[in-house]
């Protein structure tokens, strides 16, 4: 599985996960690329709950990604703490779709 990151994701992941935690996330997604729930109206963009440092999945991180099934690739789009926001706004979803050209 090939992982491609947006610049925003790269900036945020370095602040929210250490190398081992990020490797564990990538391993999980490589084994279970459909693990995240598809965000309605997103064209297939998924949201995965992920435990952050010292937190469980429910209060941890939200990983936003897109699984390119035919390309065996995952685009890592956005990452945020649940305490920052519950869900992506419709505008955020629209921008992510445009970035992927879906």
PLM segments and residue spans:
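Arg/Lys-rich, positively charged N-terminal/basic patches that mediate binding to nucleic acids
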Residues: 1-20
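Residues that recognize and position ribonucleotide moieties
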Residues: 2, 46, 86
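Sequence/structural signature of beta-propeller domains
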Residues: 8, 19-20, 24, 31, ...
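Short Gly/aromatic-enriched secondary-structure transition segments
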Residues: 13, 25-26
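A short, surface-exposed loop/turn module that caps and links secondary-structure elements
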Residues: 27-57
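Short polar/acidic secondary-structure junctions
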Residues: 53-55, 66-69
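Short, surface-exposed coil-to-beta transition loops
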Residues: 59-63
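Enriched for short, Lys/Arg-rich terminal
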Residues: 67-102
């Amino acid at each position: 599985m090939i992982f491609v990151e947006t610049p925003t994701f790269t900036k945020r992941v370095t602040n929210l996960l250490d190398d081992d935690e990020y490797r564990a996330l990538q391993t999980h997604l490589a084994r279970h690329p459909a693990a995240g729930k598809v965000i309605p109206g997103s064209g297939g963009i998924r949201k995965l709950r992920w435990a952050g440092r010292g937190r469980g999945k429910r209060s941890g991180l939200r990983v936003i990604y897109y699984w390119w099934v035919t390309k065996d690739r995952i685009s890592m789009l956005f990452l945020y703490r649940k305490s920052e926001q519950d869900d992506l706004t419709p505008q955020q979803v629209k921008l992510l779709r445009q970035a992927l050209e879906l």
